[in-house]
Amino acid sequence: LPSRQELPVVAPSRAMPEEAYQDLLEKAGAYPLAYWRPLLKVLLVLLGEVGLTVKEVADLWKEDVREKSLLVRGTKLREVPLSPLAREVLSDWLPQREFLAGHQPLPYPHLLLKPAPGKNRGKPLGLGEAKWILTEFADFAGVKAEGKRRADLALPLRWRAIRRFLKEGHPREKVAYWTGMRSLMTRGWEG
């Protein structure tokens, strides 16, 4: 196994450009299946503003949302600050989440609940379903795969959040802690 210093360094050039991110947020409002639109916006913002992984987003509970921060239960519990946009999108989502939770006899504690009509409405959005809706949305938004990679929104959005944190002047150590992106701490990484 190579030592930590020998691991390839992922450049922030993989970050989604600001214009593309704003375009995605606009396209989320035009997604053909209207009941997915609010959830898509939450998903995009938690990836692109907060820097979470899709798994971390799918595992969030409603009680993890604080006024200005978010508790993330990954390999380690951590508290991540929320941008004003993330706070706004989450405050818009929470009333709809409560409505969806009311469709189940015993409401689930998860933050993201399935909005699609049917017997599964109000059940937690799992990792597979979160990846599926992101893939469907990428097709709708016209996001093209680069090289042999499939069109993946999650990693460029996550790097966009990292770039935002660094531009705001937060230390790399703090950003690595918030996002769980340990490669920020490797020697030779240039932000």
Regions found by a protein language model. Give the residues of each.
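Flexible interdomain linker/hinge and immediately adjacent N-terminus
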Residues: L1-E26, T75, A116-K123
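N-terminal DNA-binding recognition helix of tyrosine site-specific recombinases/integrases
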Residues: L1-R4, G51-K55, F137
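Basic, Lys/Arg- and aromatic-enriched nucleic-acid-binding interface segment
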Residues: A20-V54, R158
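Short, basic (Lys/Arg/His-rich) helix/loop patches that form interaction surfaces
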Residues: L33, W132-M181
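A short, glycine-centered helix-capping/turn motif at helix boundaries
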Residues: L46-D59, E168-H170, T179-M181
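Conserved tyrosine-mediated DNA breakage-rejoining catalytic core shared by Y-recombinases
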Residues: V50, K55, D59-S91
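Short, polar N-cap/turn motifs at the start of nucleic acid-interacting alpha helices
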Residues: D64-E67, H170-E190
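Basic, alpha-helical nucleic-acid-contacting "clamp/cap" segments
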Residues: G74-N120
